[in-house]
Structures are given as structure tokens and as C-alpha cells.
UniProtKB/Swiss-Prot annotation:
Residues 14-32, 1077-1109 have a biased composition (Acidic residues). It is a single-pass membrane protein. This is Coiled-coil domain-containing protein 136. The chain crosses the membrane at residues 1130-1150. PANTHER family: CENTROSOMAL PROTEIN OF 170 KDA (PTHR15715), COILED-COIL DOMAIN-CONTAINING PROTEIN 136 (PTHR15715:SF26). InterPro entries: Cent_Immune-Sig_Mod. It comes from the Eukaryota. Keywords: Coiled coil, Cytoplasmic vesicle, Differentiation, Fertilization, Membrane, Phosphoprotein, Spermatogenesis, Transmembrane, Transmembrane helix.
Length: 1154
């Protein structure tokens, strides 16, 4: 802490001492000038007087001349060195300019490439938009056509409905006409009944008269007339019944309800008629019984014969009607079968249309076979229907013949007229039924067409829904884009915040410079108070305690590493034992097991259990290592807290110094105490360096151990490959090896990715070890200053923790992968050794042996499962733009396939469409097309958004380039202003005869300007950072390091030359300054390694500004003050140390602000 404060306050102390010494030297120089003027006057007087000079005066003059000559030679050497430095800086500046020009060319090429890609993407987007617009226009045209067809179909359906209604009205008129004719028939029957009643009344009157009065001739005539009337009545009644039944059957086909009503009326009339007939027959039977007559018997016989004939005709008509109904039922069944077959045919056609894009031959063959079978069924059903129609026509012709035969029996004119009317009505009914069937067929066709158009309309609605879904997806993607924009805005705000932070740091640096100038102008720094010393001592004690804790944790870490090495050795030993177990297991896998294998399998099981226990032990040790790493992190956090307390104490100490300035003598006394404290800190840092050396040695041992394990793994893989070849050669000899080979193939497939995993983890451990070495070297270079060494130690410990974690993980994965190799080797490695001839075992041993083999295989499978779990996590991700392009291509292909399917569906619409059950399949095709269109639209929208983001990024890149250019323009002006002031101060002080070691004040000013330029350069480099140029920058950095080493050598030589003149100073300040110079040189090396780019630009600026200072030294000195002595050197030796101190100040301010 005190060493750091000394480093911070050292420039102020030097400047105050130099001011005091300059004042004293000015007084002495004035006195010397007066003396020299007096001596010159005395010499001239003496010369005029002819007197000679004394020897003492000659010696003084000679000493002055020699001193002036020596100073002149030194100034010439320094001028030559500065000229060389200026040339080197000019070369570096030209290299930097070339690098910036090359970088600008690379940027322009990248911008041109991006612009070309943007143009190509815009052209693709325009083409896709044109295609989409054309597709939309085609779909709209198809929509208009479908709507026109739907309207025409609706008009046709309305026309058919009106025709159907007119047909129904005509049929209703015919029905009314038939009802009127039936009423006329009923009226005629009433007349006949009246005549019969009158005849019966006359007969009764005649029978009531005496029998004697009646003659046999009259009686016989009456009986004949009565018989004739009865026969006529019965015939007419039967004929009426037949006509009524035929009429009811015909009218029943038109209107079932009206036919039922007429049938009920006829049945009621028949019941009344039979009652009347039975009453009349009873009366006649009574009369016959009273007066039997042969003529009456003849009439009765004829009546019975006629009744039997009518019953026969009636039965035949009923049989024909039953056959006709059966044929109609069969026809309906055949029509239903035909419809079902048509539906199946349509389903098959739809399936064919659906799977036309598929490339599977088997599915196409199955569909063709199904279509052939359905076509055959349809043809058979058509043939059956044709046969049924022929049978129906034959039956109708037979029915007509029977009706014609029936009409021959009718002798009455009125009955013939009725039959003619009935035939006409029957023909009209047949015509009406045919027309009705035609209308039904037409109606079915119209319904099918209407269904097709409805399906098409549904398809169009689905397309509209798909467009809506695509719009929803567009909104979702827009929301995602907004989120990306927000993230980008957040990152941009973060960049602005960092830039603002850099600006604040620059402002703080300027304030610090102003405060330093005020301190230089006012009073020297006083000695610290007792309280501040006590606080510093307590903080140092806490720091030592934390370092001891850190050492203890490092020792524990080393012990854990040793235990890990022991575990690795145990693992190798278990590996050898596992190889022996594999050989024994191969002996067990033979088709005829040998005796004594049961014990070997038991030993194998015990060894596998030991291996599992060892793995669990290893995992426990890894958990302990993780806990120790966490404890180490806690210790580092405590160190960070102490560092913050130190920073706060330093700030408060600065404030106290500004508020309470004292004499300069106190500052000189406090310098010794700070030097002692800095020595203590140096010893502590050396102890830390020794500790880091030990850690590095341990890490190298671990790396060598891992390399040896990797070599052993490669050797085992080579042995495994040889065993596999031997197994393939011996496969022909025994069939049981096939099972072992299959299990080996599975285990080897799981082993290959585990090998890759092991290699990857080993590569990561090597990289982490390299990072650890880099960080450790950085700790070695920065071990002289507390802050730098602390930062590097924290980074080194973090890198060491990471590398240690990766080594532990790599050892775990290596162990897992080795377990997989050992489990897979069990199926092949010792097969050759198992071919030895031994005696076969007993059946009991065979059974036990099989059980043990099963257990061993289960154990090995469990070990393989553990390694497969770790392999599943390694999957590579593709870039988003490539995914989108691939997805776009797939969507284009699917869209083309859907367009082909749509065209085929439109062609199928011209053919007779499928029934209503096929709507589901058509809807599935429509939904699929809609999903494809949605995916295509989403991909197009996503591509457009990516293009927009790309344009925004290009615009931001241009803005960053403009800012970079502005910063470069501002930088030279600021540097020139600062350098002009510093050059004036340097020339004034050198003209007054200042010594070599006292030119620290202008150097501190130049360091301030260097800090300003460094801040601006860091802002520039922040924007110039590019991942693509890291390799080139690494090579350039190596060259620059060589150049800087040469410059350091030149500076050290200059320091050695000028060291003789610094002997006259007191001992303590010389020692303090020499140690500080060494620290500063080491810190300078560290800064040169970390910030080479920024220092190159600073050197360029220094060279550009120092060259005019060296060219015009006398003019600036003459403008200030004339001196009789020669020009002293412009730059002196402590310049490098002050530059390093200024760099440390800048780092301290950066850390406190962060």
C-alpha cells in the first residue's frame, strides 16, 4: 500500500525538489556569471597592463572548458540517439498507416460484398412477390369461376325444383280425376243395388201371392233372371275389386297416404257388401230350401265356377305383385350396392390423387389392385341391375297380358271403357315414374355438383383461413423482431454507457493532472499521520492472513491433485484387471463352456463391483475439489474487498493531502517508511511467485499424465481393432460368435463417440492449460506492483480453477470412455485365448455359467448407458440463415406438389364427383395446402426481417466508421497542443543548465499527454476490434515486441552511460530511484504486452511531436532566456520511468472507476 502511494506521489515529490534545486542553481549561475564577467574584465585589464595569469585561474578555465566539451559531446550523443528514435517512430507510424489503409480496404470489400448480397436478396424477394401476386390472381380467378358455377347450379336446381313441383301438381290432378271416376263407379253400383232391391221387392210380392197363382214358367223365368243378375253382380263386384286394387297400387306409388285412405274405404265397403251378400244368399237358400229348382242349382254352380276363376286370377295377381315387390327390393339393394361401390371408387381415386407425389411403388400397386377389385364389383353390380330390369320388364308384360286376358272376359261396354281408362292411367303412371326417376337422377347429379362446388368453396375458405394464419405468424415474427431490436438497442445502450465511462475517465484524468499541477505549484506532500499508518498496517495484516489462507488452499489443491493421480493409477490397474476379465469373459462366450468358468465369472463380477466403487470414489473426490475451488473463490473475494478498502483509503489520503499541505521535510522522512513497506510487499510478492511456480509444475505433471493416458488409450483401441479382425475370421468356425459380434457392434458404436468426447475434452484441457500458462506469465511480469500482481493472480487462479475443472471433467469422461472400451472389448479381445482345448463342464455348471454371463453383460450395459448419456449433449447448431434457406427450398417443393394436386383436383371436378363421405379427405388435402402456404409465407417474412436487420447493422457500421474518423482527426490536435507546452518547458529548463536526472517535470507532462492519447486510442481500438483480424494482429504483435526489445536495450545503454553523473546524489534517493526504475521497467514490459496497439499509436504521436522539438532547440531557448553555456540535452534518463508511472496512474484510475 505504501509502495503504491509512493509510486502515485513520486512525480509530485520530484517536481518540488527540482523546483527548489532549479532556484538554487539559478542563483549560483548568476553569481558565476558575475564572477566570470569580473574575471574577464580583470583578464583584459591585466593584458593591457602586460601582466600574466596565475596557475589557479588557468586551471579553473581549463576545467570549465573540459566540462563544456564533455557536455557538448553528451548532448551530441543524445541528439543522435533521439534522431534514431525519431526515425524508428516514423517507421512505426508508416506501418500503422499501412495497416489502417489495409483495414479500410478490407472494410470496403466487406461492405461491397454485403451490398451485393443485399441486392441478390432484394431481387429474390421481388421475384417471390411477383410469383405470389400471380398465384393470388389465379386463385381469385378460380374463385370467380367457382362462384359463377355455383350460381348456375343454383339456378339449375331452382329450375328442377319448379319442374318437380309442376310434375307433382299434374300428378295431383290425375289423382283427382281418378277419384272422380271412382265416385262415378260408386254411383253406378248404387244404381245396381237399387235395381236389385226393386227386384227383390217384386220377388217378395210375387212370393207372398198364392203359389197357385204363379205358373211354373213365370217362376222359372224369374229364377233365371235372378241368377243372371246375381252372376252379373258377382262378376261386376269382382271386377270392381280388381280395378280398385290396381288403382290403389298405382295411386300408392304416387301418394301413400291417399292410397291407404282409399284402401280403408274399399275394405269397409267390401265388409258391408259381404254382409249384404250373405243376407241375400241366406234368403235365397231359404227359398231354395223351400222350393228347390234345378235351374237355380245350375246358376249357383256357374256362380261358384266364376267365383273360383276370379279367386285364381286374384291369387295370380297377388303372386305377381309379390314378385314385383321382391324385384323392386332387389333393385333398391342393387342401387345401394352400386352407390356404395361408387363411393369406394371415389375414395380410391382420392387416395390415388393424394399419393401421386409419393415415390413408394408398393402403395401405388396396392391402390391399383383395390381399384381393379372395385371396378370388377361395380361391373358385376351393373350386370345384376340390368338383369333385374329385364326381369321387371318381363313381369310387367306378363301382368299386361293377364290384364288383357281379364279384359276378354268383360262383355259390357262400360267395363271395357273402364279398362281402357285404367290402361291409359297405367301408361301415364309409368311415364310419370320414368320422368320421376330421370328427375331424381338429375337431382342427384345436381346435388353431386353442388357438393363439389361446396367443397371447392370450402377449399377457398380454407385458403383464406390459411392467409389469416400466415398473417398471425407474421405478427408473431414481427414481435420476435421487436424483441431482437430491443436486445440490439440494449447492447447499443451498453456501448454508449461504456463510451460515456471512457469519457468520464478522461475527465477524471484531466482533473487529476490539474490537481498534480496545483500540488506542484503550492507545497510538497506532508508525512502521513499516525491514524493512516495504523489503517495501512491493519490492511497489510489482513492481506497477509488472506495470502496464508490462499497458500493453505493451494496446498489442499495439490493434495487433491496427488489423490487424483493415485486414482488414475488405480484406474490403470483396474484397466489391466479388466483386460484379464475380458479374456475370461471371452472364454465364457464359447458355444461349449469349459470347466472352472463359474469361479472366473464370479471373480469378474467382484472386479466390476470394485470398478463401480472406484468410480463413485472418484466422483466424491471431484466434489471435494469443487468445494475447495469455491473456498478459493471466497478468499479471492475477500482480497477484492481489501483492494476496495485500499482504494478508498488512498482517495481519502489524497483528500487529506489536498486539505492539509505541510513542509517538504516531512515528505522526505515519509519516503523512507514507504520504501521499507514497499520492500515488505516485494518479499510477499516473491513468495506468491514461488507458490505460482509450484502450481505450474503440478499442472505440467498433470498434463504429462493425461498425455500418457491418451497414448495408452490409443494403444487399447489398436488392440481392440486387431481383436475385431480376429473375431471376423473366427466367425465361420462357431455360430455363437455372431451374438457376441452383434453386442460388440452396439458397444463399439457407443464407444466411438465417447472416444471423440475424450479427445475434445483433452483438447479443452490443453487449451485451458495454455491459458493458465499465459496468465501465469502475466503474473510473473506484474509481480512487482501490488495491484497488477493481484489482478493477474485473480485471473490466474480463475483460469487455474477452470483448467482444473476441465481436467477433472476430462478425467471423468476419459474414465467413462475407457469403461465403454473395456465393456466393448469383452466380446472380442480374449477370443483367441479361449480357443484352447479343455474338458466340457457339467450341465449344472453350464446353467450357473449362463447366469453369471447374463449378470456380467447387464453390468457392462449399465456402464455403457452411463457414457451414452454424456454423448447425447454434444450437438452442433447450424446458422439461422442457412436453415431459413433450406426451409424455403423445401416449402417451394411442397408448394409445387400442392399446385399439381390442385390441378388434378380441378380436372377431377369435371368428372362425376364422389359422394358426401369423400369431403373429409378433400378437406385434409386443403388443410395440408394451407399449412404449406403458411410456412412459405412465414419463411418469406422472416427473410425480409433479416434483410432489414442487415441494413440496420450496415448503417451502424457506417456510423462507427465516422466516429472513428472523427476521433482520429481530434487526436492529432490534442496531442500537438499538449506537446507544444511540454516542449517549451523542456527547452527552458535545459537552457538553464539542469542536470541529467532532474528533467522529470516535462516528462510527467508528456506522460499526461500520453495518457490522453492512450484514452483516445483505447476508444478507437474499442471500435476497431475485429474477430477476423485477430490472427494477423497476433503476428504483428510478435514483430512489434522484437522492435520494442531493441528500443529497451538502447535505453538501458543510455542509462548506463549516464549513470556516472548521478553518483553525486545522496545514497538513499539513488537506491529508491533505482528500485523504482526497475519496477517501472518491469511494469512497462507488462503494459507493452497488454496494450501494444495503443502504445504504437502513442509512439507515432511522440515521434511526430518530438522531431520538431529536436530540430528547433535553440530557438525555443532563445525565446525564453539566453545562456552563455552550450545547449544541454533535451531529454534525460528518468523519462521511461516517469512514463511507466503515468501508465500505472492511468491503470489505477481505470480500476477505481470500474
Amino acid at each position: 500500500m505504501q509502495a503504491m502511494e509512493g509510486e502515485v506521489l513520486l512525480p509530485a515529490l520530484y517536481e518540488e525538489e527540482e523546483e527548489e534545486e532549479e532556484e538554487e542553481e539559478e542563483v549560483e549561475e548568476e553569481e558565476e556569471q558575475v564572477q566570470k564577467g569580473g574575471s574577464v574584465g580583470s583578464l583584459s585589464v591585466n593584458k593591457h597592463r602586460g601582466l600574466s595569469l596565475t596557475e589557479t585561474e588557468l586551471e579553473e578555465l581549463r576545467a570549465q572548458v573540459l566540462q563544456l566539451v564533455a557536455e557538448l559531446e553528451e548532448t551530441r550523443e543524445l541528439a543522435g540517439q533521439h534522431e534514431d528514435d525519431s526515425l524508428e517512430l516514423q517507421g512505426l507510424l508508416e506501418d500503422e498507416r499501412l495497416a489502417s489503409a489495409q483495414q479500410a480496404e478490407v472494410f470496403t470489400k466487406q461492405i461491397q460484398q454485403l451490398q451485393g448480397e443485399l441486392r441478390s436478396l432484394r431481387e429474390e424477394i421481388s421475384l417471390l412477390e411477383h410469383e405470389k401476386e400471380s398465384e393470388l390472381k389465379e386463385i381469385e380467378q378460380e374463385l370467380h369461376l367457382a362462384q359463377a358455377e355455383i350460381q348456375s347450379l343454383r339456378q339449375a336446381a331452382e329450375d328442377s325444383a319448379t319442374e318437380h313441383e309442376s310434375d307433382i301438381a299434374s300428378l295431383q290432378e290425375d289423382l283427382c280425376r281418378m277419384q272422380n271416376e271412382l265416385e262415378d263407379m260408386e254411383r253406378i253400383r248404387g244404381d245396381y243395388e237399387m235395381e236389385i232391391a226393386s227386384l227383390r221387392a217384386e220377388m217378395e210380392m210375387k212370393s207372398s201371392e198364392p203359389s197357385g197363382s204363379l205358373g211354373l214358367s213365370d217362376y222359372s223365368g224369374l229364377q233365371e233372371e235372378l241368377q243372371e243378375l246375381r252372376e252379373r253382380y258377382h262378376f261386376l263386384n269382382e271386377e270392381y275389386r280388381a280395378l280398385q286394387e290396381s288403382n290403389s297400387s298405382l295411386t300408392g306409388q304416387l301418394a301413400d297416404l291417399e292410397s291407404e285412405r282409399t284402401q280403408r274405404a274399399t275394405e269397409r265397403w267390401l265388409q258391408s257388401q259381404t254382409l249384404s251378400m250373405t243376407s241375400a244368399e241366406s234368403q235365397t237358400s231359404e227359398m231354395d230350401f223351400l222350393e228347390p229348382d234345378p235351374e237355380m242349382q245350375l246358376l249357383r254352380q256357374q256362380l261358384r265356377d266364376a267365383e273360383e276363376q276370379m279367386h285364381g286370377m286374384k291369387n295370380k295377381c297377388q303372386e305377381l305383385c309379390c314378385e314385383l315387390e321382391e324385384l323392386q327390393h332387389h333393385r333398391q339393394v342393387s342401387e345401394e350396392e352400386q352407390r356404395r361401390l361408387q363411393r369406394e371408387l371415389k375414395c380410391a381415386q382420392n387416395e390415388v390423387l393424394r399419393f401421386q407425389t409419393s415415390h413408394s411403388v408398393t402403395q401405388n400397386e396396392e391402390l391399383k389392385s383395390r381399384l381393379c377389385t372395385l371396378q370388377k364389383k361395380y361391373d358385376t353390380s351393373q350386370d345384376e341391375q340390368n338383369e333385374l330390369l329385364k326381369m321387371q320388364l318381363q313381369l310387367q308384360t306378363e301382368l299386361r297380358q293377364l290384364k288383357v286376358m281379364k279384359s276378354t272376359l268383360v262383355e259390357n261396354q262400360s267395363e271395357k271403357e273402364l279398362l281402357c281408362r285404367l290402361q291409359k292411367l297405367h301408361l301415364q303412371h309409368q311415364n310419370v315414374t320414368c320422368e320421376k326417376e330421370k328427375l331424381l337422377e338429375r337431382q342427384q347429379q345436381l346435388q353431386e355438383e353442388l357438393q363439389c362446388h361446396e367443397a371447392e368453396l370450402q377449399h377457398l375458405r380454407d385458403t383464406v383461413a390459411s392467409f389469416k394464419e400466415s398473417n398471425e405468424k407474421d405478427t408473431e415474427t414481427h414481435a420476435q423482431l421487436q424483441e431482437m431490436k430491443q436486445l440490439y438497442q440494449a447492447s447499443k445502450d451498453e456501448l454508449e454507457r461504456q463510451k460515456h465511462m471512457y469519457d468520464q475517465l478522461e475527465q477524471d484524468l484531466l482533473l487529476c493532472q490539474l490537481e498534480l499541477k496545483e500540488l506542484k505549484a503550492s507545497h510538497p506532500i506532508p508525512e502521513d499521520k499516525g491514524k493512516c499508518a495504523n489503517k495501512c498496517d491493519t490492511l497489510l495484516s489482513r492481506l497477509t492472513e488472506l495470502q496464508e489462507k490462499y497458500k493453505a488452499s493451494q496446498k489442499e489443491m495439490g493434495q487433491l491433485q496427488m489423490e487424483q493421480c493415485e486414482l488414475l493409477e488405480d484406474q490403470r490397474r483396474m484397466q489391466e484387471e479388466q483386460g484379464q476379465l475380458q479374456e475370461e469373459l471371452h472364454r465364457l462366450t464359447l458355444p461349449l463352456p469349459k470347466s472352472g468358468l463359474l469361479l472366473k465369472s464370479q471373480e469378474l463380477l467382484t472386479k466390476l463391483e470394485d470398478l463401480c466403487e472406484l468410480q463413485l470414489l472418484y466422483q466424491g473426490m471431484q466434489e471435494e475439489q469443487k468445494k475447495l475451488i469455491q473456498n478459493q473463490d471466497c478468499v479471492l473475494k475477500e482480497q477484492l474487498e481489501i483492494h476496495e478498502e485500499l482504494r478508498r483509503f488512498k482517495e481519502s489520503h489524497f483528500q487529506e493531502v489536498l486539505e492539509n499541505p505541510d513542509d517538504s521535510k516531512l515528505a522526505k522522512s515519509s519516503k523512507c517508511n514507504r520504501n521499507k513497506q514497499s520492500k515488505l510487499l516485494m518479499e510477499q510478492m516473491q513468495a506468491l511467485q514461488v507458490m505460482y511456480d509450484a502450481g505450474q509444475a503440478k499442472q505440467e505433471l498433470l498434463q504429462q499424465e493425461q498425455g500418457r493416458l491418451l497414448e495408452e488409450r490409443k494403444r487399447l483401441q489398436a488392440d481392440l481393432q486387431l481383436c475385431l479382425e480376429e473375431m471376423q475370421l473366427l466367425q465361420v468356425q462357431s455360430p455363437s460368435i455372431k451374438m457376441s459380434l452383434e453386442s460388440y457392434g452396439k458397444s463399439y458404436g457407443s464407444m466411438v463417440p465417447s472416444n471423440e468426447n475424450c479427445r475434445k475434452t483433452y483438447d479443452t484441457t490443453v487449451d485451458d492449460n495454455e491459458s493458465y500458462y499465459k496468465s501465469y506469465t502475466s503474473t510473473q511480469t506484474s509481480s512487482k506492483s501490488f495491484l497488477k500482481s493481484y489482478d493477474s493472480s485473480t485471473s490466474a487462479s480463475e483460469a487455474y480453477g477452470k483448467s482444473y475443472c476441465t481436467t477433472s471433467n476430462s478425467s471423468i469422461t476419459y474414465k467413462k470412455s475407457y469403461g465403454s472400451t473395456s465393456s466393448s472389448d469383452t466380446c472380442q479381445k480374449s477370443f483367441v485365448s479361449s480357443c484352447t482345448d479343455e474338458e466340457p463342464a457339467e450341465p449344472e455348471d453350464m446353467e450357473r455359467f449362463e447366469e453369471m454371463v447374463v449378470k456380467v453383460l447387464i453390468k457392462l450395459q449399465a456402464v455403457q448407458a452411463m457414457y451414452q448419456i454424456s454423448q447425447e449433449e454434444h450437438s452442433q447448431l447450424q446458422e439461422q440463415m442457412e436453415k431459413l434457406l433450406a426451409k424455403q427450398k423445401d416449402l417451394k417443393e411442397e408448394l409445387d406438389a400442392c399446385e399439381r394436386e390442385f390441378k388434378e383436383c380441378m380436372e377431377c371436378l369435371e368428372k362425376p364427383m364422389a359422394p358426401q363421405n369423400d369431403k373429409n379427405e378433400i378437406k385434409e388435402l386443403q388443410t395440408k395446402l394451407r399449412e404449406l402456404q403458411l410456412q412459405y409465407q412465414a419463411s418469406m417474412d422472416e427473410q425480409g426481417r433479416l434483410l432489414v436487420v442487415q441494413e440496420q447493422l450496415e448503417g451502424q457500421l457506417q456510423c462507427c466508421q465516422e466516429e472513428l474518423r472523427q476521433l482520429r482527426e481530434k487526436r492529432p490536435s490534442v496531442v500537438k497542443e499538449a506537446r507544444g507546452k511540454n516542449a517549451n518547458k523542456n527547452m527552458n529548463k535545459n537552457a538553464n543548465g539542469v542536470k541529467m536526472k532532474k528533467v522529470t517535470k516535462p516528462c510527467s507532462d508528456t506522460s499526461e499527454s500520453d495518457l490522453e492519447t492512450r484514452k483516445s486510442l483505447e476508444v478507437v481500438l474499442y471500435y476497431k476490434a475485429s474477430q477476423r483480424k485477430l490472427d494477423g494482429l497476433a503476428k504483428e504483435e510478435e514483430k512489434k515486441e522484437e522492435m520494442e526489445e531493441e528500443k529497451k536495450q538502447v535505453k538501458e545503454e543510455a542509462k548506463e552511460q549516464c549513470g556516472d553523473e548521478l553518483v553525486a546524489e545522496p545514497a538513499d534517493p539513488e537506491e529508491a530511484k533505482s528500485t523504482e526504475d526497475q519496477e517501472e521497467n518491469e511494469e512497462d514490459k507488462e503494459e507493452e504486452e497488454k496494450e501494444e496497439d495503443s502504445e504504437e499509436e502513442e509512439d507515432d504521436a511522440d515521434s511526430s511531436l518530438e522531431s520538431p522539438e529536436e530540430n528547433n532547440p535553440l530557438r525555443l531557448s532563445e525565446s525564453k532566456k539566453s545562456s552563455p553555456t552550450p545547449n544541454p540535452p533535451i531529454f534525460s534518463l528518468p523519462l521511461v520511468g516517469l512514463v511507466v508511472i503515468s501508465a500505472l496512474l492511468w491503470c489505477w484510475w481505470a480500476e477505481t472507476s470500474s
